[in-house]
Amino acid sequence: MSSNTFTLGTKSVNRLGYGAMQLAGPGVFGPPRDRHVAITVLREALALGVNHIDTSDFYGPHVTNQIIREALYPYSDDLTIVTKIGARRGEDASWLPAFSPAELQKAVHDNLRNLGLDVLDVVNLRVMMGDGHGPAEGSIEASLTVLAEMQQQGLVKHIGLSNVTPTQVAEARKIAEIVCVQNEYNIAHRADDAMIDALAHDGIAYVPFFPLGDFTPLQSSTLSDVAASLGATPMQVALAWLLQRSPNILLIPGTSSVAHLRENMAAEKLHLSEEVLSTLDGISRE
């Protein structure tokens, strides 16, 4: 099995990290049902070895970053916090693009303030084109240039991308050094196979979201049968498959439950045989 660490920016991080999206209220909007539980989950994540947390100030909005600060500040030196800009929330909880220079600059400063930081470790430009639900072609030069300028000002250490096409990745790499790409990818949704391999060749991290499908979890009898045969959960198998898919894949499964967090972290110890991997590879063709 590949190494359990990978370099993100200038730090080595454990490949099984934590996504903070579910720490906000229902629909990633408003406060959590129990703030104490959210704080406990974050502290337990670090106790279990997590040193890569994915967040955004548009989760809540503001909520997850404020909880992260309350739970973990002052931050340990080995912790990498990755955030995203490029979207905002409407009063009705809708997800809206926020791509103007002023909106991008405000988002960086909102993240800094709510996390209690002077500089952000990694900022992903979250691209919302087309219907906003998946990557769509279109130039990101203007928006990325704004983010690169904030990097030059010392507000951002490293830059990443989210919800992008291969063409946009190539465009971005001509403007700034890109340390990670965050797209939807899982055992059933494998449109980025070629991108993952190309990024791995260049030492760039790939961070899949929705590891078991989007807000409607993947229903696969094959996955369920494999999980049962291994004495594992479908999510654990899906995470283990991703870890073995490529050494540059960093995982950020999210949860608001300590028990579920521990289940997710146990996936790191689950080794899938070549026979099992071959069976699971067939899910994308079902």
PLM features per residue range, with description:
Residues L112-H133:
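Active-site groove signature of glycoside hydrolases
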Residues M1-L79, R285:
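N-terminal binding-site loop/beta-alpha segment at the start of enzyme catalytic domains
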Residues P31-A45, F99-L115, T165-A170:
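Short, acidic/polar
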Residues V50, L117-L120, V156, I178:
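A structural motif
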Residues M128-E286:
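Beta/alpha (TIM)-barrel catalytic core signal, keyed to glycine-rich beta->alpha loops juxtaposed to Asp/Glu
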Residues T10, A47, R69-T80, R113-G116, ...:
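Acidic (Asp/Glu)-rich catalytic clusters
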Residues D78-E91:
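A short, structured active-site edge motif that brings together acidic residues
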